[in-house]
Amino acid sequence: MPTDVLTVCPAPTGTTWVIQSEGYLQGKTTIPGDKSISHRALMLGALASGETTIQGLLLGEDPRSTAHCFRALGAEISELNTEHVRVQGIGLGHLLEPDVVLDAGNSGTTLRLMLGILASHPDRLFTVTGDTSLCSRPMGRVIKPLQQMGAHIWGRQSDTLAPLAIRGQQLQPIHYPSPIASAQVKSCIMFAGLMAEGQTTITEPALSRDHSERMFAAFGANIIVDPDTCSVTVTGPAQLHGQAIIVPGDISSAAFWLVAAAIVPGSDIWIENVGVNPTRTGVLEVLEQMGAKMTLANQRTVAGEPVADIHIQHSQLHGTVIEGAVIPRLVDEVPILAVAALFAQGPTTIRDAAELRVKESDRLTAMATQLQKMGANITEQPDGLEIQGGASLQGADVDSFGDHRVGMSLAIAALNATGSTTIHRAEAAAISYPNFVATLQQLWHS
């Protein structure tokens, strides 16, 4: 029978989770809508003419930040209290100059993609900010190419940190060779290119997630993708038209349950309606390399995105090396893969993941230090982690650092630990997975 494996406790600084586990995961579940697609559906719907309907939108804090900002810019967006949302677009080029500061909350996607949109709307002044974490995250990676297009952006530390002020301009198209494979950088420039006259091309060193490319095409943008050169070209000015969007389940959220089922003896679960876009399935490939007993069923395409149901059972995992071109395809799953590696036979090495140091927290430091408290043999490297498998974890007092993925990854590690684990600042899970606790209670049996 399902049991209360996790207790939610109010705390002076937020919410604390207390996990006392003895059991296994069993059953079927669905997961919240994909966060990346949810953001883009709201933004493109706001910029399009006509109505956009969104089914399966993630009702997390980050998409709420996006909706809040675009309402202030003139779009009509229904309340995010159900997964069915309507957006009445204001039309590309017709954003209003807001009389408030646009607050992106904790959402790097909201802020970075929105910069490309705001910078390309001439004769308007915008001010954007975020929470303490977001205001410490690097924005220079998107501001630099926007300035090459003619954008006027000012901010702290030589125009690299929020709060930021933007004076919209008529931008010029560019060819930008991005030094990093980042869907946020690519998408920011793509949004800016919608209003520039001519072809804007972005080339990456490796493929990053391609939700923007798929959705730009669906909304009517003139876009050319060349996978051989990892480049995408947007021709502006564009005309966008409202669409009916169906958001699949977020594979980054599914990853927590995939790893939990793989490492907890006796577990056997199905996760239904998971987005399996090939630019996001690095986590599946790595788990298969590690020996996970996993199959994909009912594979289909829904609103232009590959979707499948995933069946996974407990199995003995083996250590591996995670590096190179696969990193952009699983960058958000590195924390939970580190947990999987703890229970594998042999060592696991994670390299080329320095990007994790500038996420909602320094995720390499956060995972290393907190898992060490639980008895893990894990060593932090400049761009990754060295993890010795065969762990025997003990419950401990750990901190999420206010990072949703760190907090949920620690919760999964606690399922295989002896004794009680207390996770502080666990309320951060609501950023991407508001019903994480409910799903765990549903799947857990003892």
From Swiss-Prot:
It catalyses: 3-phosphoshikimate + phosphoenolpyruvate = 5-O-(1-carboxyvinyl)-3-phosphoshikimate + phosphate. GO terms for biological process: amino acid biosynthetic process; aromatic amino acid family biosynthetic process; chorismate biosynthetic process. The active site is at D332. 3-phosphoshikimate binds at K35, S36, R40, S182, Q184, D332, K359. GO terms for molecular function: 3-phosphoshikimate 1-carboxyvinyltransferase activity. The keyword Chloroplast does not apply. Its main location: cytoplasm. Its EC number is 2.5.1.19. Pathway: Metabolic intermediate biosynthesis; chorismate biosynthesis; chorismate from D-erythrose 4-phosphate and phosphoenolpyruvate: step 6/7. Pfam families: EPSP_synthase (PF00275). It is found in: Cytoplasm. GO terms for cellular component: cytoplasm. The keyword Mitochondrion does not apply. Phosphoenolpyruvate binds at K35, G108, R137, Q184, R363, R405. It is an enzyme of class 2 (transferase). SUPFAM superfamilies: EPT/RTPC-like. Keywords: Amino-acid biosynthesis, Aromatic amino acid biosynthesis, Cytoplasm, Transferase. Belongs to the EPSP synthase family. NCBIfam families: aroA. Monomer. PANTHER family: AROM/DEHYDROQUINATE SYNTHASE, PENTAFUNCTIONAL AROM POLYPEPTIDE. Catalyzes the transfer of the enolpyruvyl moiety of phosphoenolpyruvate (PEP) to the 5-hydroxyl of shikimate-3-phosphate (S3P) to produce enolpyruvyl shikimate-3-phosphate and inorganic phosphate. This is 3-phosphoshikimate 1-carboxyvinyltransferase. It comes from Acaryochloris marina (strain MBIC 11017).
